[in-house]
């Protein structure tokens, strides 16, 4: 692995520019909480997460991992994807709800996400 992040993580303090460092700080913050599920070096914990991402208006609910045998305790949960090369994989979220990384990031930094959809109980607790 040889991305600017990888070089930075291995001690090259000049591998990330100021904007990238600011993004890394948001990524690691308790506000966005990205690093709780998107853990380096693959930037995924390979688990299922229930994020509370709303479905696009007019679309049926995607039950996600609940459709997988043995995953009934994860209603509307989805496998945490890697964030490697994320800028090349738009749109974002399981439903493609967000067209830009900024929109996806703001979903988490503005207090949304990491929540059970309105009217549902968190069965994973």
Question: Which role fits each region the language model picked out?
Answer:
Residues 1-125:
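Periplasmic c-type cytochrome electron-transfer domains
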